[in-house]
Each structure stands twice: as C-alpha cells, then as structure tokens.
Amino acid sequence: MTRRCDITGKSVLSGNNVSHANNKSRRRFLPNLQDSALQSDALGHSVKLRVTPRGLATIEQKGGLDAFLLDTPNRKLTDEARTLKRRVAKAAARREAKSA
C-alpha cells in the first residue's frame, strides 16, 4: 500500500536531519494519512480512502465527496480518485435517468 493521499496526492518526501553541529543524516517525511470511510450519496454507501486531514477539509469545503470529485478536474486527481469519480458520475446519471 503506497503512502499517498487518495485525494490530494501528497506522498513521502525526503530530506535531512541537521544537528547543531551541522551534521546531516537522511530522513523521510511521511504524510499524515488517515484511513477514513467517506459517505457517497450517489453510490449510496461509504467508500474507504486513505486521506490526509487537509484532503478531508477540502472535501468538506466542497460539500461532500461526490461534489468534490465531480467539481475537480481529472488532471488534479489521483488514479483511485478518477476511478471513484467515474463510478459516482455513472451512478448520478443512472439516478437522474431513473427520476426523469
């Protein structure tokens, strides 16, 4: 499982620990990933994603998972999010056709 946010795409960075004597040793900066189940209104069930707190805040700001996915261009989404976006769009179109 990759250490990458499914929404924002944030991943592991590398750098140095620098001591007071200016000795440098390599280290990794890991993203703060949280396993979360987000409710999708179009799909009718929750979807499990690995998301950073910043990604969760972005989803909430946009008005939920479905609104975030449909509003965000594909070039800004990760592969997992693009797959989920297609599923949400299909389910929303199916629901729209059913109500019409």
Curated annotation (Swiss-Prot):
Question: What biological process terms from GO does the record include?
Answer: translation
| A Gene Ontology cellular-component term | ribosome
The family assignment reads:
Belongs to the bacterial ribosomal protein bL28 family.
Compositionally biased intervals (Polar residues): 11-22
Question: Which molecular-function annotations from GO does this UniProt entry contain?
Answer: structural constituent of ribosome
Q: Name one Pfam family in it.
A: Ribosomal_L28
Name the gene that codes for it: rpmB
Chain positions covered by the region annotation Disordered: 1-25
User: What name goes with this protein?
Assistant: Large ribosomal subunit protein bL28
Indicate yes or no for the key word Ribonucleoprotein: yes
